Amino acid sequence: MESPPESMAERKRRLVAGELRDAALMLLATKGFDAVTVDDIAAVAGVSRRTFFRYFASKEDVVVRFLADMGASVVTELAARPRAEPPSAALRHAIWVPLAACTDRADHTERARIVVRLILDTPALHARWLDRQSRWRDALAAELAARHRLDPDTDPYPRMAAGMAMLALDTVLRQWQPGADEQRLAELTDQAFAVVAPALDTPGASQP
């Protein structure tokens, strides 16, 4: 069934939210998290402070939405992979999609890298990052359990595999250096999954 067409109000709301997100990420990337205020973000986006708070609860919330979009795509991509595909390949693809989206333009790549560093290095943002990772891990574990017909309450594989996938993502992000392009990110992703692939590709091995 096709989704209903987007209304004018929905389109406007999506566009304004996107402008606020882009303004926030640009400022955070160039000035640092603590130096940016909500007023700064609203001014760059060309809206009022009140309008900002119609879309986001705080500047932290802008980054959390950025993370939420990344996590949602990971789970969606895994669910779309062929059931016969090795788990390491399916999870590698699922993790790679949001990473590749960060490198769709040269200017976007460096901005995304800096924002990722802010997330990892700013305690308030890193706490949100860990919370989001926990949610993604649960969602990935549920999908892996369904794919391999395992009970996540009795078989450790789904949660362990989901945790390894999240660890691979975290490792790639931490190794993302200035000037790294899409090819370099792909190499880092391959290296991370090469480490965990032997364990990922043995679903059910924990069963007696």
Indicate residue ranges for each PLM-predicted region.
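Amphipathic alpha-helical segments enriched in hydrophobic/aromatic and basic residues
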Residues: 28, 37-38, 59-70, 91, ...
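Hydrophobic alpha-helical bundle segments that form small-molecule/ligand-binding pockets
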Residues: 122, 134-161
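Basic, helix-initiating cap at the start of DNA-binding domains
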Residues: 1-31, 35-47
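Append "Primarily bacterial transcriptional regulators
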Residues: 40-43, 52, 91
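HTH DNA-binding helix-turn interface
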Residues: 7, 31-33, 53-63
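C-terminal peripheral helix-coil segments that are non-catalytic and often amphipathic
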Residues: 3, 142, 146, 178-208
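Hydrophobic alpha-helical connector segments
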Residues: 72-115
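Amphipathic C-terminal alpha-helical segment
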Residues: 128-132, 158, 162-182, 198-204
